[in-house]
Regions:
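Extended amphipathic alpha-helical scaffolds
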Residues: 1-174
C-alpha cells in the first residue's frame, strides 16, 4: 500500500521540460496528516489541500470547477500607517468618515465582483462589510491563508496572485 501511494505521488509530480523529466517532491507534494483513521485510509489527492473554512455562514462550501481569485491584500479599510488623530466636531464628521470607509470597501468589492469568481482566497484580512458584499454576490471567501498554500493553489489552478484589486485582469483568474 505504501509503495503504491509513493509511486502514485511521484507519477503525479513528474514535470517534463525540453525532453527531461524532473521530479521535485518538496515543491509539488505535501504530506498532510489527519488524526484518526487507518493506513488504508491514506490516499494521494490531485490538487491542493489546506485546513481553512469559509468566513461567512451563507457562503457556498462545495463548488464544482470554481473560478478562483487569489489576493495578497487586505479587504479592509486601510488604517493610517502612523499614529493618526482625527478631531471630529460633530456627528456629520463621524458619518462622513464612516461613509468614506464604506465607499472604499464597496469599490474593492466591486473590482472583485466584476470578474465573477466563485472563490476568493486572500492572505490577509476581510472586513465584515466586505464579507457582506461578497456573500451577496455569491462569492465564497477564505482569508488568512499562508503564502505557500496560495502559491500551490496558483500553480494548480493556473491563477495569478494579485496585490491590488484595481489591477486584476481576467487572465489572473484560475
Amino acid at each position: 500500500l505504501a509503495c503504491n501511494i509513493a509511486l502514485d505521488a511521484v507519477s503525479r509530480v513528474v514535470i517534463e521540460e525540453n525532453g527531461r523529466k524532473e521530479i521535485d517532491i518538496k515543491r509539488y507534494a505535501k504530506i498532510e496528516k489527519i488524526p484518526g483513521g487507518t493506513i488504508e485510509d491514506s490516499k494521494v489527492l490531485d490538487g491542493v489541500m489546506f485546513n481553512k473554512d469559509i468566513i461567512h455562514a451563507h457562503m457556498r462550501r462545495r463548488i464544482e470547477n470554481p473560478r478562483i481569485m487569489l489576493l495578497d491584500c487586505n479587504l479592509e479599510y486601510k488604517k493610517g500607517e502612523s499614529q493618526t488623530n482625527i478631531e471630529m466636531m460633530n456627528e456629520a464628521d463621524f458619518t462622513k468618515i464612516l461613509q468614506m470607509e464604506e465607499d472604499y470597501i464597496q469599490q474593492i468589492c466591486a473590482d472583485i465582483i466584476r470578474f465573477k469568481p466563485d472563490l476568493l482566497v486572500t492572505e490577509k484580512g476581510v472586513s465584515d462589510l466586505a464579507q457582506h458584499f461578497l456573500a451577496k454576490a455569491n462569492i465564497s471567501v477564505i482569508r488568512r491563508l499562508r503564502k505557500t498554500d496560495c502559491l500551490r493553489i496558483a500553480r494548480a489552478a493556473g491563477a495569478t496572485i494579485c496585490s491590488r484589486t484595481d489591477e486584476i485582469k481576467e487572465e489572473d483568474i484560475g
